[in-house]
C-alpha cells in the first residue's frame, strides 16, 4: 500500500466519519466531533468520485446536515470544516463555511456511499427547549472609545498612484507611500485613529479625509521608509522637507485641517461597540463569557490592555517593525514569547492582559508592545524582533493543571494528561504491577531511579512518592534520599497508627508531604483514632469522601480538621445518577479483590455511599475540600480532572445558586474557588507553589490556552516552560494548519531534549543534596520541594473552610455545622456529549 502518514490519518478520519454516519442512520443527533467527521469524510469521498469542483463541494458541504441532525450546541461550535483531497488536478483545499445552515440536511448525500439506510426526518424532531450557547458572551454597557485623550487632526489624502494603497492602524503616517498626497507636517508623530489591526484603503485617484492621532509612548519613529528616525520632538522640519523632496515624498499643506482631542469631540472620536470590540480583541472589563457549555459565566474584572493600542499580529496589523514591534529593544527586556489580549482565569483573578514569557518563565502580565509608540507598555514586556506571538484574542489562559494523585500504571497516561491540560503529575508506581494498580507508591530506590529516568524527556513536571507504610524510619529515609518528593500511606499496605506516626515523623525530618489513604476496614481504629495519630501534623488526605478508600463511613470528617489538606478523586465528581452503580466493579479490580469472597465484597460495598458522595459535592462548593485529582486508572480518570471539576461547579450552581449573593450576576467567586482546586492548592500542598500552580510573574510558563466554547473539555494549546508542547493541529501535508483531521498532537516542545529543558523533576531536599540529578544522569531541572510541614487548611486558597462534620453511622447522613448536606444526583452534566466521540 505504501501509505503515507497523511493517508493513515485520513483513514482515522474516515472511521470517525463512518461511525457518525451509523449514528445518524439510526436517528442519533450528532455532536461537534461527529458532525465534523461526517462532513469532512463525505467531502473526501465526493473528491474521489472525481466529478465535482472545489466550488461545488463547498456548497454540497453545507447541505449534508441540518439543525435537526445535530445537537443544539453544535450550531454554535461548528463554523467551518476544511479538508484537503486529491482532485483530478492535484491536491486542493475545500472549505465549508457555516456547514449547519439548513433546517434539515440532505441525508441521502450525508450517507452517500455508506450503504446505510436513510432515516426518516421524523426521527429528528424540532427542539424547543432553551439552547445553551457554548462560549457565549454577554457584553457590558456602553461603547469603547479608542485612543481617548490624544491630540487628533483630520487630513485630506489623495492617492496619486496607479495602484491601491492600504495603511494599517499603527503605521507612522508620515512614512506612508510617497504618492499619497497630504500635509505630512501635520501628520508628523501621528497615526490613523482606527481600531488596532485594521486599515484604511486608498484606491487609485481616491480622495478621502482621515482622522489621525498622536502615537503613544515615548513618541519615537523608526522604520517605515526611514524619513524620520528618532524622537518626534527632535525632528528638524527643514531638513525633513529636503529629505522628502529628494526622495519624492509628496506633501501638500492642508490649511483647513481641523484639530481636537479624541474622546472629547465627536469629530475626532472613534467608538466601537462592545460586541465588535470583543469579537476583535476578546471581552473587556465588565463583559462576561460562558465557560464551555456550563452555566458558569466569568466576568472580566480588569483589562490591562490599552484601548486603541492592542497588540495584534498579522498582515497589515500592529506587531510590525517600528509599530507595535520595537527596534533594537534591550535584550534583557525583550520577550521571547507574548500571548496577546488573553482572558486569564486564575485563583488570583479573572482579567484581560498580555502575558510575557522569557527563558521559560512568566516575566510580565499586563500591557506588552513597543514603548516608543504605545501607551502603558510595561518595562519588561517589550516586543522586539526576537519575540514570537501567540494570538490570545478571544481565548482563555489558565495555569497548567496539577494532578497530585497519579498511579503511574502506564506511560500512556502522560499523553492523555497533557492533552487535557495537565502539566504536572505527582504520585507513585512502577507500571502495571498490582501494587501500582492499587497504590501510588514507588517503593524502592531502584524503582525511583527508573521513574525519574523514564520520565526525563517527557514534557511534564513529575514528582514521585515513596511507600510510607512501615513503623520504623530507616527504609523511609532510603526512599526519600533516593528521590521521593513525598510519602504515601495506603491501606493496602497497612495504614496503621504506628505507620502513620512514623511516616509523619520522617516527613517532618525531611520537609516533605505525606499523602494518606486511610483504613476502610477500621481494623486498627476508627477515623478519630487516625486523626489522633496525626497529632496535629500536616497531612494530605486522598479521596476524603471515601469511595476511593478510607474509614467507612465517616472519613469525610477529616474535611473539618485544620491540619488536614483534603482532596477528592474524580470518579465521584460530581454526584450523578450512575455514579454509585459504576463503582463496585471499579473497586474490585483496583484493589485486587475477589467477588467470590463475601468479605471482599462487603469491603467494597462499605466504601460506596450515595449520601457521602452527595455531601462531597456540597463540601467542595463550601470550600471545605481543597483539591481535585484523578486517581488515574485506579478508580480515576486522568483526562477528566479539569472537566469534572467544572461539572461539579456547574451542578452546584444549579442546585445551590450563587456563592456570593452580592455577585449573583456572575460566577467569579465560584470559578476562582474551583480552579484553585487543580492549580494553586495542589502546588501549595506539595511544596512547589513558588514555581508552578498559577498565572503569576516569576513562575514557570506552564499555561493552557482554551477556546471559550471548548473550555474544560478540549484545550487548544498547552505551553510547557514557555514552549508549545501540545496543540490542536491538522493535516501536516495541508496548505494551512487547520484542515481535518485536527488532532491534539505533540509539538516541538515535546520532542528531543525539549521536554527535559522545559520541565522539572521534583525531589526532596535530601535527594537534591545527594546529587540524584548527576547520579541518575537526569537532564531535567531538579528542584526540591519545601515548606510543607507547617501548612494548614487555612493555607488552601479559597478552599479553607473548617466545618464541624458528622456522619450518622447507620444512615450515612452528613452534617456540617449542624446542617444536613444532601443534594440530588445530576441526570446530565456539561462538557460531555457535545464534545466527545465516545
Curated annotation (Swiss-Prot):
Substrate binds at residue 490. GO terms for molecular function: nickel cation binding; urease activity. It comes from Arabidopsis thaliana. Disruption phenotype: No visible phenotype under normal growth conditions, but mutant plants cannot grow on medium with urea as the sole source of nitrogen. The keyword Transit peptide does not apply. It catalyses: urea + 2 H2O + H(+) = hydrogencarbonate + 2 NH4(+). This is Urease. Pathway: Nitrogen metabolism; urea degradation; CO(2) and NH(3) from urea (urease route): step 1/1. In the C-terminal section; belongs to the metallo-dependent hydrolases superfamily. Urease alpha subunit family. PROSITE patterns: UREASE_1, UREASE_2, UREASE_3. One of its GO terms (biological process) is urea catabolic process. Transmembrane segments: none annotated. Ni(2+) 2 binds at residues 488, 517, 543. Keywords: Hydrolase, Metal-binding, Nickel. The active site is at 591 (proton donor). Ni(2+) 1 binds at residues 405, 407, 488, 631. The gene is URE. Binds 2 nickel ions per subunit. GO terms for cellular component: cytosol; urease activator complex; urease complex. Pfam families: Amidohydro_1, Urease_alpha, Urease_beta, Urease_gamma, Urease_linker.
